[in-house]
Regions:
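Conserved active-site and cofactor/substrate-binding residues in soluble primary-metabolism enzymes
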Residues: 2, 41, 45, 57, ...
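A glycine-rich, hydrophobic loop/mini-helix early in the fold
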Residues: 2-54
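Long, charge-dense
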Residues: 26-35, 72-105
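Flexible, charged surface loops at secondary-structure boundaries
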Residues: 52-57, 74
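Structural motif
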Residues: 59-61
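Short, active-site-adjacent cap segments at secondary-structure transitions
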Residues: 68-70
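C-terminal folded domains that constitute the principal catalytic or ligand-binding module
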Residues: 86-145
Length: 145
């Protein structure tokens, strides 16, 4: 299991990239953490180190893994989960942009109106989910070399 962080500017140009070392879950961890293991791995072992490694402070951190919302306590910026959805699944309390719905961490729900214009600007410049493909490709490249 790996994690990656790519900070892009409004045009989608990369400003900063980090990735974690591979994580290997032991049987003891599976037993001890039980149902909380995935939240722990994503929030503490992957998301936490990535957010702590950043040099620049983004307006918000987008993630395509909802479990990474649990990393919120490790960074100064709001953490927002993005997922593709159809028009029937959209919830009013989230930010809807085209086929995407953005859900801030509960700690950042009060900032939703402040975040909306930033995401609207970003989505007019790039396809919101595309940077996640670049993260995965960069991690794959690093693993193969």
């Amino acid at each position: 299991m790996f994690g990656g962080y790519l900070l892009v500017d409004i045009t989608g140009r990369p400003l900063e990239f980090h990735c974690t070392a591979p994580l290997r879950v032991t049987r003891a961890q599976e037993i001890l953490y039980g149902a909380t293991l995935q939240r722990y791995l994503h929030g503490e072992q992957i998301g936490g180190p990535l957010l702590k490694a950043t040099k620049l402070t983004p307006v918000a951190v987008l993630t395509d893994r909802e479990l990474l919302l649990h990393a919120r306590s490790h960074g100064a910026s709001p953490v927002v989960a993005i997922q593709e959805t159809d028009s029937q699944d959209k919830k009013e309390e989230f930010i809807s942009l085209g086929t995407f719905q953005l859900r801030p961490h509960e700690k950042d729900m009060s900032k939703i109106d402040q975040l909306r214009p930033h995401f609207e600007s970003l989505s007019s410049s790039i396809e919101l989910a595309e940077p996640f493909d670049r993260i995965r490709a960069a991690i794959d490249e690093a693993q193969n070399h």
